[in-house]
Amino acid sequence: MKHLARIVALGDSILKGIQVDPETKRYVTRNEIGIPALERDFDLTVRNDSHFGASTVKGARLLDRMLERGLACDGVVMDFGGNDCDFKWAEIAAAPAAEHLPAVPLPEFIRSYRSMIGKLRQRDIVPILTTLPPLEPELFFDWWCGRLDQGAVHR
């Protein structure tokens, strides 16, 4: 396998290094994902084109634009999924018995990801896929539901 010297990171807030500040409860970019160490230890250059709120649908559009402009890299790290599988929690709280779909339904998520992978491979760019980090369900639920009727959301 060839040395992947030029890497582009394409994903959501996790790959961007955005976290919630425990004091202010606001989003901050901390960049504690170790890109400088990776560049140094593995002789890489990494350009982080990740975006807050990105899903596979937005990622596919971003990748298309990058490819049209002549994306010059050896590999693309892709980290999507968290925003794809999110729900509109206020709508769930207002109508818990109704059907609610994730932001990007699973068939579209699969189609978008496969399309991105295929486009990269056609250009001899290695797709590097990551998986979501584990989350703490109670903290996640409390954060996203906030002041909503959590009992209704649980139904």
Model-derived features with residue positions:
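Alpha-helical cap/lid subdomain in secreted, periplasmic
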Residues: 2, 61-155
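Glycine-centered flexibility motif
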Residues: 11, 17, 53, 129, ...
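Solvent-exposed loop/turn segments at secondary-structure junctions
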Residues: 13-16, 42, 51-56, 82-86, ...
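Conserved phosphate-coordination/catalytic loops
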Residues: 28-29, 53, 57, 107-110
